[in-house]
Curated annotation (Swiss-Prot):
Domain Myosin motor: 48-736
Keywords: Actin-binding, ATP-binding, Cytoplasm, Cytoskeleton, Hydrolase, Motor protein, Myosin, Nucleotide-binding, Phosphoprotein, Repeat, SH3 domain
Taxonomy of the source species: Eukaryota, Fungi, Dikarya, Ascomycota, Saccharomycotina
Ranges of compositional bias, category Acidic residues: 1268-1279
Similarity annotation: Belongs to the TRAFAC class myosin-kinesin ATPase superfamily. Myosin family.
Region named Actin-binding: 419-502
Designated name of the protein: Myosin-1
Gene source species: Lodderomyces elongisporus (strain ATCC 11503 / CBS 2605 / JCM 1781 / NBRC 1676 / NRRL YB-4239) (Yeast)
GO cellular component: actin cortical patch; cell cortex of cell tip; mating projection tip; medial cortex; myosin I complex; plasma membrane raft; prospore membrane
UniProt biased composition (Pro residues): 1116-1126
InterPro entries from the UniProt entry: Fungal_myosin-I_SH3, Kinesin_motor_dom_sf, Myosin_head_motor_dom-like, Myosin_TH1, MYSc_Myo1, P-loop_NTPase, SH3-like_dom_sf, SH3_domain
Name of the gene: MYO1
Coiled coil (UniProt feature): none
Amino acid sequence: MAIVKRGGRTRAKQQQAPAKVNNGLGAGAGAGGGIQKAEFDITKKKEVGVSDLTLLSKITDEAINENLHKRFMNDTIYTYIGHVLISVNPFRDLGIYTLENLNKYKGRNRLEVPPHVFAIAESMYYHLKSYGENQCVIISGESGAGKTEAAKQIMQYIANVSVDSGNAEISKIKDMVLATNPLLESFGCAKTLRNNNSSRHGKYLEIKFSEGSYQPIAAHITNYLLEKQRVVSQITNERNFHIFYQFTKHCPPQYQQQFGIQGPETYVYTSAAKCITVDGIDDGKDFKDTLNAMNIIGLSQAEQDNIFRILALILWTGNISFVEDESGNAAIRDDSVTNFVAYLLDVNAEILKKAITERTIETSHGMKRGSTYHVPLNIVQATAVRDALAKGLYNNLFDWIVERVNLSLQGNQGQSEKSIGILDIYGFEIFEHNSFEQICINYVNEKLQQIFIQLTLKAEQDEYVQEQIKWTPIDYFNNKVVCDLIEATRPQPGLFAALNDSIKTAHADSDAADQVFAQRLSMVGASNRHFEDRRGKFIIKHYAGDVTYDVAGMTDKNKDAMLRDLLELLGTSSNAFVTQTLFPPNLLSELVDSKKRPETASDKIKKSANILVDTLSQATPSYIRTIKPNQTKKPRDYDNQQVLHQIKYLGLKENVRIRRAGFAYRSTFQRFVQRFYLLSPATGYAGDYIWQGDDLTAVKEILRACHIPTSEYQLGTTKVFIKTPETLFALEDMRDKYWHNMAARIQRAWRRYIKRKEDAAKTIQRAWRMKNHGNQFEQFRDYGNSLLQGRKERRRFSMLGSRAYMGDYLACNDKTGFGRFVVNQVGIKEPVVFSAKGVILLSKFGRSSKRFPRIFVLTKSNLYIIAEVLVEKRLQLQREFALPVHLIKSVGLSQLQDNWVAVCLLSPTTTTPDVFINLDFKTELVAQLKKLNSGLSILIGPTVQYQKKPGKYQTVKFAIGSGPHIPPLIDSYKSGTVTVNQGLPPTSKNPKRPRAKLGKVDYSKYYNRGVRSLAQPAFQSQPTASYRSEPAYPQPTTQLYATQHQPQQPQVPTRTASRKAPPPAPSTQTAAQVSTLPQAARKPAAPARPAKKIAPQPPVKKAVSPQPPAKKTVAAPPPPPPPPALSKPKHPTYRAMYDYDGSVAGSVPLVKDTIYYVLQINGKWGLVKTMDETQEGWSPIDYLQEESSPSASAATQSYAPTTASSNPVSTASSNTYTNTTQATTMLNGSLGNGLADALKAKKSEETTLAGSLADALKKRQGVTRDDSDAEDDDDDDDW
């Protein structure tokens, strides 16, 4: 993008940093940078505890537990430790995973919303898009803590926010990803004592995203260590995998007939544990979800039939039972069962019987093949072979389902490089009897804990040391020693190595292999304090607690290889799904021909765990630490001891301590500059990177431009460290709003241009209409006057030439303001024709009538009378009456100049009565009513009659009076009589509208962007001791001299005055002097910034050339000439002795000790005007005391000359005042001889002072221009 620079730009302007946008730590600020309140809009309940454990006052395990307990009992299950999420399983649905809740986390950082798993998912997806880094989430915790549910919700969130509903292929991938949850839960989860939906396998789901749009285009699932032992045996009150109960309870009819499926109580594998039905598990609904997931993923009907055929085969295999024959060997109890199993497997029944009751042994002599023997098995051995067949079938079936799902999810992976990984793996387990499955599960959890330690604790501290960041080291437990105890091979072999060696030594006899393994344990843990050897058992001190493992059967489980007899049996099957898919021919050949030791289960889990660690290390991790609050699986049951134990072994206290002492964000200098260079005008311009220096200096410039305090960051050798997440969020928010602000700036410039064009067009149109058709408001005024012409005395203000009938005086038709508030409050929907304030005469019981203030609003249909009332000490507006215009029969007025009007209806009622009102714009109201209701009668006479109540007439008399009790221009009501002063004759007419004075167009309204207006001074001078009114600021000296005294000089084009002018010189005129000036001189002055390129000049003759400005000297300029003598005020001045509230209509309130003009005295009332002549009205003369003259001492103090020690700014200010005072006095024609002589004598000094002032203003111009965009050629394009 090309850089287009505006002419005359200064370097200071170009490098000025953009204003920091402060929006309350959250997104949602407006384009104009306005501060908006950040609030938690998801829940309105009071925050319980702290949402981030780093905010705890005491960092102890007990304090963490207490905070989690409070939040858990308040149904708040999520808490942060920095960016780590702590989740406590509620064991019930809290309604926090709805689509509405999900949408509230889209595009929000974690501080704007309460802690939630959705916030973690949003953070992962945001960093994937913003930084292009692979993401993963590690969910850890013991079994039943809620890991699987957290993984499901993360998948749901990412699929929802990343998918374009218009792309069918993307939507299909999303649906398939979500469908993997119910499918793999059915085949891989089971009910245990601790968890009704415990994952009995590990799963790492990797969702791949497209470049640019970051939408899911593929996915891949990695499976880890299925607990296949559960297929054949479970402890009491546990269940087999969910799919067996779903299938047997709700099997379709065709499968019942084809596969002979019956209820779960029929099969040994589903009924032995005596737990068929579980509260909270709906097997029927789950089975429908499983079938639906199969269809979404794309499993054909044939593939589904094969799956359920294998499930039926496994169930019927478990029902094969044995008895002892005469030789003590195992024999089939019921041949019908084996025959049906052979039917399902598509093998010969006799071959099946031999495979599970006999064992084939081959002997060899060197390279020669030996003899083959068929050894019969006893009942225990035959049962083990039967179970091995069932476990092998289910394990391979599960692996095939995962591969088949991956085949459907592979999509177009060639376009994908970025991914988000979700790890859902079995949690830490401690049972009464722990075997090989538990040591594998706990080993994987140890590896995950090691990743957490390396990536959050150790790596963080190591990085601080490497980057030379100030840091206080914190001790922590590194569990690498436990991982080495299990997986190491050298120098000290671990448990897995010992298991493999035991199998190699005694491979034929499982019991002998267990004994060898028990002997090797003494060498494994000889020097490891985390290991204890017991007889037939051993203890490993895991990070989550001590676990005792049984040696018996561990070596046999580690073999993880099907017997050769079983593989040969499966090879004879006629079912291609079995022989080609589940058990391909190469399995048997590898088992027979391979000279290498077969891969054991420990080898597989170790290999898978290391691959998982490498995968997670290549991504940016997020962490969710789940906590199980009880063992009863009941809601609102919180076991403090159990939770405290988990807090300790999860290391939450150490995590909090490191988090509070560390940094929330770190990045290399290059990446930080690439991300945030837009935030500084020195590094970025219009989206282009323009920095020429090194990255470290660019980082400093960006942080300086964004006003980030040094306490919030540290700079290392290669990275920048941001301490708090709030600072990072502020930087991200400013970056997000950069282009938005640029667009808003262009829009403002365009709207400003359009506004000027519209205003100019309106001005021309208004002048044209007035020339051709006259002023409609004045025409309507003349129409209203004609209605009363010759019949009613008129008030002086009604006959002004500038009086026009504008109608809506309260601005009810505007979109904002008091008038709009009024109509909204009372529910007026129609356009308003007339609105004004006034009073109404209401009678009170037991006393005479009294005036009450009211608001009058007239529409085309109704005349509304609105009252302001106090309700519970709050002012409210209430509609008192709504009088239909077409029902108004007449209006009554007197012949005098009063403002009373009686509005009479055809049939008055209690809700729509006649009213007797008083308002200044009575004539205009009558004219509007007459215009809307042409049949309206206007009754004018010495009395006015109206119905006080329906059927009860009230007559009000009017009389001319005088005296102290009747203020001028104000009437007095008493006992049914209104007394008023004499008014203007009834035949009076309005003179022509006075011509407006010509003046320069004020363009400041086009640049109102939060700075001071041109009409407002940059500061307010202190009022004098005698007066409270604000001072009037003088006109700029340059304009007065150039206009009045040098008309012969050619005009120099000037630039439009700056929007933000420098402060003018303080005025030292007293209010008395200001009052003596003519009206033209007393108008508000412009700021004291001169027009460009025009220096102030003294008055000179035509033949004399102006003297060049003298050079600057260090000597202080001479003091200004003395002020002119104080002239006599044009009106008598009075001091207020008491406060007066001005409650009477037409009066002016008085403030004690304030000076006022008194224009006229009539009895006990005086016509009072404020010193600034903004208010005029009647006030009691007894409250005032006449002043002899203005305070001379105040004036003398105000005109004190500037001393030689005054600074140049003060000198220039005094000089500006002097020039202005002289010019103003010359304009008024009242220049004294003494002042004229002083001016002539000081001609050269004034020229020097004027030049100095011009130079000072020119220097100041560069500063003020930077803060102003009022120039016509400045379109706010400084990016």
